[in-house]
Amino acid sequence: MTSRRWFHPNITGVEAENLLLTRGVDGSFLARPSKSNPGDFTLSVRRNGAVTHIKIQNTGDYYDLYGGEKFATLAELVQYYMEHHGQLKEKNGDVIELKYPLNCADPTSERWFHGHLSGKEAEKLLTEKGKHGSFLVRESQSHPGDFVLSVRTGDDKGESNDSKSKVTHVMIRCQELKYDVGGGERFDSLTDLVEHYKKNPMVETLGTVLQLKQPLNTTRINAAEIESRVRELSKLAETTDKVKQGFWEEFETLQQQECKLLYSRKEGQRQENKNKNRYKNILPFDHTRVVLHDGDPNEPVSDYINANIIMPEFETKCNNSKPKKSYIATQGCLQNTVNDFWRMVFQENSRVIVMTTKEVERGKSKCVKYWPDECALKEYGVMRVRNVRESAAHDYTLRELKLSKVGQGNTERTVWQYHFRTWPDHGVPSDPGGVLDFLEEVHHKQESIVDAGPVVVHCSAGIGRTGTFIVIDILIDIIREKGVDCDIDVPKTIQMVRSQRSGMVQTEAQYRFIYMAVQHYIETLQRRIEEEQKSKRKGHEYTNIKYSLVDQTSGDQSPLPPCTPTPPCAEMREDSARVYENVGLMQQQRSFR
């Protein structure tokens, strides 16, 4: 399980019912502290339009439902009953299903809050990426509803690589909507608490000073709260000497990871293949390149095209199965690579092509025309393409093409080319709505074709706009699959696609645009959820909402996804033997410098 924000630490039973009935669907659930038995918990589940409350006992040794299976943590109990449908029943035998976790909002939008992170994971992060004084805040796994401040400490010199460096964990209690570290002053928010101890460091009884010098920021966010993260990333630097801030800081950190992705590109560097590359240094990784199998066996370089397979990893990790959708990221065709392009499309059984560039921009060729005129037929080497029809939407042109091998015209395949025409020559679109509507149409088409191969995406170099479109589409697919309350990680997703094709997402503007597009998608989706709830209450049929104000010429919106995630993934348990060095063992040093 990748998140435990189904736990709501500060709500009553009435508030839980209201949340589940207004934001949830049948099968939605949450956990909360028991008001009648302090220390115990309650599982609230929506079923048949009503809410059932189930008591969870915390004996101090284990968690259970007053009988039955016993668990070390609340998270393990919830995960077990999510995975084992039919195990949770009422006295009359009716099954209670836990399908969709209804997540609680993060207690803060600060980037130092890492949410569901174990102690071991925090130590690994702080050791590998932090330095003396680096800190983060996370949810407590042993005490649901509380939090933990994890700080990297070192010797007095603050040498980050010193063998004496360690990580200290301080429990943060949350009681009656106030936060404290087991004694002393209480604070209205986690942010107030952290700011206080940044100025007034805590000191262990052994003398170690817990200096909160610099936050170790997370890039993980709850998709539903992306507006708060965008607001944080958009803040100006606090001081003029602090250049790195927000989007620029995240993107620059991502750029510094490129040295970890120096995979071989020998095939693209071969002398015989150099004229097949639009840009001499933008080459495909060997381990993910598309290998053409139908070439001349006497011509070893006939298997080469500047293209890579991109496989989203979020599904394979959770489901151990082949992803529903994959991509081919490739460059814009050259005159001498058009034949190879169509060989690739045919070989991979690709049925959808996404073109994100004009043929010529600012007087420079970006992609040669690789399709025939409307109602015309043209042969490209061993492949034949027939342009059946073209239709123009506001931002793109849709072409219906028939592809076959020369001499095998009776085995034509339909290939749909979506040509996005309104990406500006400089920068990125001012409104992400047009891109989202475009990707929605592409998604519907791909979904409608049985056993369709990878979606082919290209611009000119096949990395900038191509990477931006693919990353946005992957993130939206995660939200479709897991719901608006799922976790997403923009830099991690970009790093994942960059491990399969070098340089995907080229500029800070493209990086920022990804955030803006996902934010726009979430806002629109939340409006649709609200409208659906209103319509259900009124008994009216639900009306779709478009991502942009421009009327589109084809396709309805996709069915509304569940509000919350379904597939549970394995989670790391907190080490029960881990000792919290809490403020009971510390004293406050107010004037430390």
UniProtKB/Swiss-Prot annotation:
Q: Which residues carry this modification: Phosphotyrosine?
A: Y62, Y66, Y542, Y580
Question: Which keywords annotate this record?
Answer: Acetylation, Cytoplasm, Hydrolase, Phosphoprotein, Protein phosphatase, Repeat, SH2 domain
- PTM notes: Phosphorylated on Tyr-542 and Tyr-580 upon receptor protein tyrosine kinase activation; which creates a binding site for GRB2 and other SH2-containing proteins. Phosphorylated upon activation of the receptor-type kinase FLT3. Phosphorylated upon activation of the receptor-type kinase PDGFRA. Phosphorylated by activated PDGFRB.
Span of domain Tyrosine-protein phosphatase: 247-517
Q: Which residues carry this modification: N-acetylthreonine?
A: T2
Which InterPro entries is this protein grouped with? Prot-tyrosine_phosphatase-like (IPR029021), PTP_cat (IPR000242), SH2 (IPR000980), SH2_dom_sf (IPR036860), Tyr_Pase_AS (IPR016130), Tyr_Pase_cat (IPR003595), Tyr_Pase_dom (IPR000387), Tyr_Pase_non-rcpt_typ-6/11 (IPR012152)
The residues the record assigns to binding substrate are: D425, C459, S460, A461, G462, I463, G464, R465, Q506
Quote the record's note on pH dependence.
Optimum pH is 7.0-7.5 (isoform 1). Optimum pH is 8.5 (isoform 2).
SUPFAM superfamilies for the chain:
(Phosphotyrosine protein) phosphatases II (SSF52799), SH2 domain (SSF55550)
Q: What is this protein called?
A: Tyrosine-protein phosphatase non-receptor type 11
Q: What are the GO BP annotations of this UniProt entry?
A: atrioventricular canal development; axonogenesis; Bergmann glial cell differentiation; brain development; cellular response to angiotensin; cellular response to epidermal growth factor stimulus; cellular response to hydrogen peroxide; cellular response to insulin-like growth factor stimulus
Q: Which residues form a coiled coil?
A: none
Provide the active-site residues from the annotation.
C459
State the function annotated in the UniProt record.
Acts downstream of various receptor and cytoplasmic protein tyrosine kinases to participate in the signal transduction from the cell surface to the nucleus. Positively regulates MAPK signal transduction pathway. Dephosphorylates GAB1, ARHGAP35 and EGFR. Dephosphorylates ROCK2 at 'Tyr-722' resulting in stimulation of its RhoA binding activity. Dephosphorylates CDC73. Dephosphorylates SOX9 on tyrosine residues, leading to inactivate SOX9 and promote ossification. Dephosphorylates tyrosine-phosphorylated NEDD9/CAS-L.
Q: Which organism is it from?
A: Rattus norvegicus (Rat)
Record-stated family? Belongs to the protein-tyrosine phosphatase family. Non-receptor class 2 subfamily.
Activity regulation info:
Inhibited by orthovanadate, molybdate and spermidine.
Tell me how this protein assembles.
Answer: Interacts with phosphorylated SIT1, LIME1, BCAR3 and MZPL1. Interacts with FCRL4, FCRL6, ANKHD1, SHB, INPP5D/SHIP1 and CD84. Interacts with MILR1 (tyrosine-phosphorylated). Interacts with FLT1 (tyrosine-phosphorylated), FLT3 (tyrosine-phosphorylated), FLT4 (tyrosine-phosphorylated), KIT and GRB2. Interacts with PTPNS1. Interacts with KIR2DL1; the interaction is enhanced by ARRB2. Interacts (via SH2 domain) with TEK/TIE2 (tyrosine phosphorylated). Interacts with GAB2. Interacts with TERT; the interaction retains TERT in the nucleus. Interacts with PECAM1 and FER.
Q: What is the tissue specificity?
A: Expressed in brain, muscle and lung.
Pinpoint the SH2 domain residues.
6-102, 112-216
